[in-house]
Amino acid sequence: MKVAVVVALLCFVCYTAAETCSADGDCKNTICDASHDLECHRGQCTCVNHATACSSAADCSGSCTIFGRHGRWHCVDAKCRCFFV
């Protein structure tokens, strides 16, 4: 029974994990809207708004869509980036 729980937990973690990458071209499953660019950032596929700079989390409010699911905007390296939560 414990093995079944562990396997189920591992399947859930793998299912919810973000798409990993080493270059922008590796991001095949991440889809950004027209006003954002797809970018591989620190090994994770993200959507980024290159036109808008940020200095705090308050500058990047609201939700976004990544992998067809809802994510949240975060201010990382002075850019608003969409990350899966």
Swiss-Prot record:
Transmembrane segments: none annotated. Detected in hemolymph (at protein level). Within the digestive gland expression is limited to the basophil cells of the digestive diverticula. The keyword Signal applies. It is found in: Secreted. Contains 6 disulfide bonds. Keywords: Disulfide bond, Protease inhibitor, Secreted, Serine protease inhibitor, Signal. Its main location: secreted. GO terms for molecular function: serine-type endopeptidase inhibitor activity. Residues 1-18 form the signal peptide. GO terms for cellular component: extracellular region. Slow-binding inhibitor of serine proteases. The inhibitor rapidly binds to the protease forming a weak enzyme-inhibitor complex, and this is followed by a slow isomerization forming a tight-binding enzyme-inhibitor complex. Active against subtilisin A with a dissociation constant of 0.18 nM. Active against perkinsin. Not active against thermolysin, papain or pepsin. This is Serine protease inhibitor Cvsi-2. It comes from Crassostrea virginica (Eastern oyster).
